Amino acid sequence: MNSIEFPLLDRTTPISVISTTSNDLSNWSRLSSLWPLLYGTSCCFIEFASLIGSRFDFDRYGLVPRSSPRQADLILTAGTVTMKMAPSLVRLYEQMPEQKYVIAMGACTITGGMFSTDSYSTVRGVDKLIPVDVYLPGCPPKPEAIIDAITKLRKKISREIYEDRIRSQQGNRCFTTNHKFHIGRTTNTGNYDQGLLYQPPSTSKIAPEAFFKYKKSVSSSELVN
C-alpha cells in the first residue's frame, strides 16, 4: 500500500472489500509511477542529481527519469530559462502525454532570479510559458526540499478530478502547434525526399522576439485553437 492514504476511500463491512471510483483508482495508480523529464539549465540541477545516490534514493518514490518527453508525465525545470530556450521548453511540454505535471525548481526558474534585473534575455518565471503545479523556491533548493515538493505533488494528484484537470490545462495553455504529416507516393531511389514529410513551422524555429510578440498580441483562447 502506498504511503499516501488512498483518496476518498469507502470501505464496506468486510475488510477485504473496497469500493471506490475509477477516477480515484487512476489517481492512486499514478502516485508511484511518476516519470520525470529533467530540464536542467543551471546549478539547481546539480542538487537534483544528489537524489540519485543512496542517501536520498528517489527510486523509492517510483521516479524513473526519461529522456523523451513522449514517455514522461512530469517535467522538472531547474535553472534559468532564456527567451531563446522558451520555444523549445514549450515544445517539450506540448509533446508530453496527458496527464502531465510541472515542478518549477529554484529562484531562477520561478522569478528569473539574479538574472531578472539587468538581463534582457531571461524569462521572468516559467509560469509565463507553461502551467506550474508546484513551486520550489531556493538558490538552490536542498534535496530534502525536492522530496517535499514531490510529496506535495503526489498529494495533489490523489485529490485530482480528471475533467477539472483537462479544463484547467486548456485554459492555461500558452502556445501550441499542430504537427501534421503529408504522405505522398514515391519510388525507392535511396534518396531522402524532403517533400514526403510536411510539417508546419514549429516553436523551435520561431525567433524568440516573434514568439513573445505573438503571445502578447493573441488571446489564450485563440492560441489553443
From Swiss-Prot:
Stretches of the chain forming a coiled coil according to its record: none
Note on cofactor: Binds 1 [4Fe-4S] cluster.
Gene Ontology CC entries for this record: chloroplast thylakoid membrane; respiratory chain complex I
Reactions catalysed according to its record: a plastoquinone + NADH + (n+1) H(+)(in) = a plastoquinol + NAD(+) + n H(+)(out); a plastoquinone + NADPH + (n+1) H(+)(in) = a plastoquinol + NADP(+) + n H(+)(out)
Record-listed E.C. numbers: 7.1.1.-
Obligatory cofactor(s): [4Fe-4S] cluster
Residues reported in the UniProt entry to bind [4Fe-4S] cluster: C43, C44, C108, C139
GO biological process, one term: photosynthesis, light reaction
PANTHER family per UniProt: NADH DEHYDROGENASE (PTHR11995), NADH DEHYDROGENASE [UBIQUINONE] IRON-SULFUR PROTEIN 7, MITOCHONDRIAL (PTHR11995:SF14)
Family indicated by similarity: Belongs to the complex I 20 kDa subunit family.
Function noted in UniProt: NDH shuttles electrons from NAD(P)H:plastoquinone, via FMN and iron-sulfur (Fe-S) centers, to quinones in the photosynthetic chain and possibly in a chloroplast respiratory chain. The immediate electron acceptor for the enzyme in this species is believed to be plastoquinone. Couples the redox reaction to proton translocation, and thus conserves the redox energy in a proton gradient.
Name by which UniProt lists this protein: NAD(P)H-quinone oxidoreductase subunit K, chloroplastic
Organism: Populus alba
Taxonomic placement: Eukaryota, Viridiplantae, Streptophyta, Embryophyta, Tracheophyta
